[in-house]
């Protein structure tokens, strides 16, 4: 393996959603260099940041029935009981909710927390307040999915934030989806909420760093005495 091949293997691929933005920043940088070189260097830094923002690294998802993995890179900002959005159709009583906040420095490709079928997709327009605030779940623009497994229904909500102005969803209703499979992206800072069945215990803590498709948030079969797996 050549040195060039080794370097290429260390650089994560870029998601196609980022191509127009990276190209725009790169073009602006060239123009700024022509006008005044210090501005050009600022543009170059922003171009590199944009490429990092849209990075789409390979993830190794734990494969075991019942495991719920993080749908996003970021920080576990809240673990609470909350009413799910009405459009999810998950009932009118509070459910365990785990929220993962993504800063502008995190990878923003969203991944399915569990294997199943996408039974519902519902978009709701709204505000763009700070996604770290609890009321963002109700007030902000969001896109909600229900993923159904043989034993449970999981709600996943993409929530726009203060900077995020565009939610992208790649999947459609009725589609089968694997755990850790890419299903969407939110541009420039946002949050993902995961609604779990009543009685599900979180295997993460508030403030913990989460990796999309890898960090285990919960185990739906965690009360099974034959379950040998334990998350760290």
Curated annotation (Swiss-Prot):
Molecular-function GO term, any one: phosphatidylserine decarboxylase activity
Top-rank taxon, per record: Bacteria
Enzyme class: lyase
Keyword Transport: no
EC number per UniProt: 4.1.1.65
Cofactor note: Binds 1 pyruvoyl group covalently per subunit.
Membrane-related topology note: Peripheral membrane protein
Modified residues (Pyruvic acid (Ser)): 190
Subunit structure: Heterodimer of a large membrane-associated beta subunit and a small pyruvoyl-containing alpha subunit.
HAMAP family hit by this protein: PS_decarb_PSD_A
UniProt protein name: Phosphatidylserine decarboxylase proenzyme
Gene giving rise to this polypeptide: psd
């Amino acid at each position: 393996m050549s040195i060039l091949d080794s370097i290429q293997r260390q650089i994560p691929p870029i998601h196609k959603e980022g191509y127009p933005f990276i190209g725009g920043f790169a073009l602006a940088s060239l123009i700024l260099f022509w006008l005044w070189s210090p501005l050009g260097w600022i543009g170059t830094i922003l171009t590199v940041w944009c490429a990092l923002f849209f990075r789409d690294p390979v993830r190794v998802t734990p494969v075991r029935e019942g495991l719920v993995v993080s749908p996003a890179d970021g920080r576990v900002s809240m673990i609470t009981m909350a009413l799910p959005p009405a459009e999810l159709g998950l009932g009118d009583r509070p459910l365990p909710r785990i929220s993962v906040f993504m800063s502008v420095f995190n990878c923003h490709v969203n991944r399915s927390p569990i294997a199943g079928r996408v039974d519902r997709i519902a978009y709701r327009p709204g505000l763009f307040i700070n996604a770290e605030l609890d009321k963002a779940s109700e007030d902000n623009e969001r896109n909600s999915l229900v993923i159904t497994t043989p034993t449970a229904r999981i709600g996943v909500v993409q929530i726009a934030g203060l900077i995020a102005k565009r939610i992208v969803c790649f999947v459609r209703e009725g589609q089968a989806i694997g755990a850790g499979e890419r299903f969407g992206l939110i541009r420039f800072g946002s949050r993902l909420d995961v609604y779990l069945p009543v009685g599900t215990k979180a295997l993460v803590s508030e403030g913990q760093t989460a990796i999309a498709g890898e960090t285990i948030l919960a185990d739906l079969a965690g009360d099974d005495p034959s379950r040998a797996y334990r998350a760290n």
